[in-house]
Amino acid sequence: MEKTFLMVKPDGVQRELIGEIVKRFETKGYKLAGAKLMQVSNQLAETHYSEHKERPFFGELVDFITSGPVFAMVWEGENVIATARKMMGKTNPLEADPSTIRGDFGISVGKNIIHGSDSAESAEREITLFFTENEIVSYEKQANNWIY
């Protein structure tokens, strides 16, 4: 079963949107395999966003993601990466469709509530950055018989 990494960013945590976001993925039928509230260190932020290191907004990105707690999650299910991207909406909340997370709650590109893996490779990399093997729980979701 495919896995993806999602993270409610500091703005989403401060605005108390964790429950709403988790509910959307549970309602969709996906399985939560790992979750934790954590403070991202500068080192972890720089590693996580290393692909943007040469971009002018890199420093602001690191400052923002380390400015408060985040809620890191691992979700599992069929096509979870692509579906999560659709559920999140476009990066710029002003361009995101209504009923997406960013369309409903996002205000600006810099504070857009949620991060999600964009590929299977990114998901694997991000999951191992934020979670140890022992923090990912493997279990059979009984509702899967009704979903898949």
UniProtKB/Swiss-Prot annotation:
The modification Phosphoserine is found at S122. The modification Phosphothreonine is found at T91. GO terms for molecular function: ATP binding; metal ion binding; nucleoside diphosphate kinase activity. Its EC number is 2.7.4.6. It comes from the Bacteria. It is an enzyme of class 2 (transferase). Its cofactor is Mg(2+). It is found in: Cytoplasm. Keywords: ATP-binding, Cytoplasm, Kinase, Magnesium, Metal-binding, Nucleotide metabolism, Nucleotide-binding, Phosphoprotein, Transferase. GO terms for cellular component: cytoplasm. ATP binds at K9, F57, R85, T91, R102, N112. It catalyses: a 2'-deoxyribonucleoside 5'-diphosphate + ATP = a 2'-deoxyribonucleoside 5'-triphosphate + ADP; a ribonucleoside 5'-diphosphate + ATP = a ribonucleoside 5'-triphosphate + ADP. The keyword Flavoprotein does not apply. The active site is at H115. GO terms for biological process: CTP biosynthetic process; GTP biosynthetic process; UTP biosynthetic process. SMART domains: NDK (SM00562). Major role in the synthesis of nucleoside triphosphates other than ATP. The ATP gamma phosphate is transferred to the NDP beta phosphate via a ping-pong mechanism, using a phosphorylated active-site intermediate. Homotetramer. Belongs to the NDK family. This is Nucleoside diphosphate kinase. It comes from Oceanobacillus iheyensis (strain DSM 14371 / CIP 107618 / JCM 11309 / KCTC 3954 / HTE831). The lineage of its organism: Bacteria, Bacillati, Bacillota, Bacilli, Bacillales. The gene is ndk.
